[in-house]
Each structure stands twice: as C-alpha cells, then as structure tokens.
Amino acid sequence: NTYGYELTGGEKEMTCMNYYTNEPIKIPLDSQLTSRENAQKYFDKYNKLKRTFEALTALTVETKEEIDHLESISTALDIALKEEDLMEIKQELTEYGFIKKHGPSGKKVKITSRPFHYLSSDGFHIYVGKNNYQNDELTFKFATGNDWWFHAKGIPGSHVIVKCEGKDLSDKTFEEAGSLAAYYSKGRGNEKVEIDYIQKKNVKKVTGAAPGFVIYHTNFSLVAEPRITLTEVLG
C-alpha cells in the first residue's frame, strides 16, 4: 500500500499522483475500512476486471475466427455447381456446429467431388479447390513442396495450386493462376484483387484450425483481374 502511511483512518477519499498524466487524482475510499482493506478492495476489483477483459478478448478472437470460417463457407457456396459440392459444404457446417446433426452421429460424407482443373497457356496444370475440405486436400496431400500456391490476400477464397513438374513457371502462368485465385474468392466482384503466391512448402497448416485455414509468410504478390481465360480440363 504505497500511500497507506498518509491515511489515519475514516477518510472518504485520498489524493495521489497519476503517473500517466502527472496530475493529482482523487480516489474514493470506504471510510469503514482501513487503508489496507481499501487497497485490497481495489486490488480485488482490478483482478475481476482483468479476468473479464481476458475472457472478452478470448471471446472476440473466437467470434472473429467463426466469422472468417462462415465467410469462407459462403464463398464455397458461390462456387458450388453440383449436389456433391453442396453435400461437402453441409458436412462442414454440421461438423463445426453451425447446423444441427440429423440421423446417426459421427457419420461423415465421403469427399468425392474434384477440384477445378485448368491448363495454362504454357501447359502447366492448375487446380482450384471448391471448398475448405478440397483446399486442405489440394495443399497438403496433392501438391508437392515446389509447386506454387496462390490465394487472394486477406479474404476468403480457393487455394490454387500450379503443378511445376520441376519447371520454372512463366509470367503468363503466374498471371493466369492469379486471375483464377481472384475469381474464386470473395473479391470476384472487384475490378482487381491482390493475390499472394508462394511455394507450397512454405504454407503451414494451423493445428486445430478449421479446414482450409493456413499460415504463410511471403513477399510475393500480384494484382489480378478476377476472370477465367482458360478452358477447364474435364474428366
């Protein structure tokens, strides 16, 4: 109790220095309590407020993560073309508690849909995930370390993988892959979208995170028009 020696008992307030403003500040006291008891009262109040702040901070982070997750699912819905695509999205919504389960619990829908597959002007194969499950499959099971990974910067969107097969990508292929990443993202309606790209070996899965969520650090980016200029490879 730094200022306890200045109190004689029965005071209703005390004046001390605010070290942040260098101005005196008056602190209300309970005249029925001793200086030590008043100090303990404020200390307990501080601890309670600190716990509340920490709980609210954690809740804010959790809510932000859920919003990001739902926005990524919303983007996948915009992409979905077939019933099997919708079934995979429904499975994700159920698995993460956004919709209630019906029927036997624990039964998962087998992932049967395939990613979009394009061929670049220079002959490189480009794959685009249709939903978060596919994004995980593409990035962490299908792609090899030196393949190139593209994603719209800071917004929900598909993982785009360019298979290198030991070759250097042409500028044209970078541009075409960037356009696909822009088109299959929340930024589809914009004139331009900033796209991050990096070799797949530098993309890491976050332990315990929802499917499709990754961490990476790159200084490589390009600005692309959200459009499809390539023909899809079917089959």
Task: Place the predicted regions along the sequence by residue.
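Extended, highly charged segments
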Residues: 1-235
